[in-house]
Amino acid sequence: MGKSVVILGAQWGDEGKGKIVDLLTDRVKYVVRYQGGHNAGHTLIINGEKTVLRLIPSGMLHPNVTCLIGNGVVVSPEALMKEMCELESRGIKVRERLLISEACPLILPYHVAMDHAREAALGKKAIGTTGRGIGPAYEDKVARRGLRVGDLFNKEAFAEKLKNILEYYNFQLVNYYKVEPVDYQKTLDDVMAIADVITGMVADITTILDTARKNGEHILFEGAQGTMLDIDHGTYPYVTSSNTTAGGVATGSGFGPRNLDYVLGIIKAYCTRVGGGPFTTELFDDVGAEIARKGNEFGAVTGRPRRCGWFDAVAIRRAIQLNSISGFCMTKLDVLDGFDEVKICVAYKMPNGEIVEYAPLAAKDWEGVEPIYETLPGWKENTFRITDVNKLPQNCINYIKRIEEVTGVPIDILSTGPDRVETMILRDPFAA
């Protein structure tokens, strides 16, 4: 009997989802993206070769896997073609194995221009977006004015819709933000040049997934960003523009929620965050700098340095509630090698003195929050590339067990290096 497994970030993104998707793809027929856009950077290292996928599902590196882009994903035609060409130049067959929902909203140059203009206007209060037009594209979707992949089938109607929406955007860009307008003809020509390639990959994603389930096929749903960046449940307004939680699978792919069997939450052995917003356990000392250095904490898409801090079990408890997480995969365990002590945030002290065990929702409710830590002995031994759990240092094992205790969720997979072979599967999500 086939299983449907969701892989998603349980923190603020950048947890190492791409590697784990790639690892588990060996046993699936389909890998599905259901939210986000090319603001996601999933880094895979296979046999020492590095690949960063932003829009195409990570299963594309497996020749027997079909990759699906669901309706919840915003698609930049330019970014999609660039990524396809990069993979095809390496001999990977993409367009024969990539299927796209016609309901995917399109990201076009005016979305990018608006994204940049808004961030510049916000100055120090900027959200910290990737500047790739994700938010404005989702806005158009909700406002019911957006262009979608399906619109590319009727080129005359597309041109007319584009003209109207570009007038709307250019009026704001020129008159309010005082920046250059986006050129209509160039935008139209660039999209039309690749329209046939994109429409050639359009398919009924919901029916494909339903048929696969009925045929007993394994399906993997690949999340982007992380739980605490969810548009509804994250640290609003310092969030992304899509539902990064498990509920986004159903709405973003058309797959019935009762058909999901297992939710794997990816967590780092510590915490990181890119951009603005609350981060209770953030470290500003030498320890934080050392974690960033050892963990090579720079964004795969933006190159921005990530903020680093101790493991936050309070935020994770919220992620467990939101996602009904079945088990964790802990990545970058080896980054904590060599520290005299390691810490776990087990509660927050609110400004009024109240002790809470679950993270607040809105960013404003995090102001003045203090972390309450448990301190555990660190380990000096090297855990890098260890693939036998029994060979881990005892203090490392104690740290893992304590995280399981304070969160109430088992750690089913451990990662001790960037390559997919540097992994320990303690409980197989497809057999759970």
Curated annotation (Swiss-Prot):
Substrate binds at residues 300-306. GTP binds at residues 13-19, 41-43, 306, 332-334, 415-417. It is found in: Cytoplasm. Keywords: Cytoplasm, GTP-binding, Ligase, Magnesium, Metal-binding, Nucleotide-binding, Purine biosynthesis. It catalyses: IMP + L-aspartate + GTP = N(6)-(1,2-dicarboxyethyl)-AMP + GDP + phosphate + 2 H(+). Mg(2+) binds at residues 14, 41. It comes from the Bacteria. Pathway: Purine metabolism; AMP biosynthesis via de novo pathway; AMP from IMP: step 1/2. Binds 1 Mg(2+) ion per subunit. Belongs to the adenylosuccinate synthetase family. This is Adenylosuccinate synthetase. It comes from Haemophilus influenzae (strain PittEE). The lineage of its organism: Bacteria, Pseudomonadati, Pseudomonadota, Gammaproteobacteria, Pasteurellales. The gene is purA.
